UniProtKB/Swiss-Prot annotation:
Keyword Protein biosynthesis attributed: yes
Gene: gatC
Protein name: Aspartyl/glutamyl-tRNA(Asn/Gln) amidotransferase subunit C
UniProt source species: Ruegeria sp. (strain TM1040) (Silicibacter sp.)
Complex formation: Heterotrimer of A, B and C subunits.
Keywords assigned by UniProt, alphabetized: ATP-binding, Ligase, Nucleotide-binding, Protein biosynthesis
InterPro entries with a match to the protein in the record: Asp/Glu-ADT_sf_sub_c, GatC
Pfam families assigned to the protein according to its UniProt record, in alphabetical order: GatC (PF02686)
Length: 95
């Protein structure tokens, strides 16, 4: 796949990036370089390789998925400029 100057201009417009007319050839060439690298990645044989999220194996502690209130209400409301009856109090914004 090859990116021409008009496609590069369209991509720049969609990304809301202002690109001068004389910079379009360089931008198109950069896009082509990136696409070439992606095509190289597509040629890599990954058959039998398990997907991973990190290069180092990680095991997370498992816990029961239970809903709690966190027992932090007093600490959280201590930061509020105005709290009433266990809730944040805010000024009325709708008439």
């Amino acid at each position: 796949m090859s990116i021409d100057q008009s496609t590069a201009a369209k991509v720049a417009k969609l990304a809301r990036i202002k690109v001068e007319e004389d910079a379009l050839p360089a931008l198109a060439e950069e896009f082509n370089t990136i696409l070439g690298f992606i095509e190289q990645l597509n040629e890599v044989d990954v058959e039998g390789v398990e997907p991973m999220t990190s290069v180092t194996p990680q095991r997370l502690k498992r816990r029961e998925d239970v809903v709690t209130d966190g027992n932090q209400q007093d600490k959280v409301l201590a930061n509020a400029p105005d709290a009433r009856e266990g809730f944040f109090a805010v000024p009325k914004v709708v008439e």
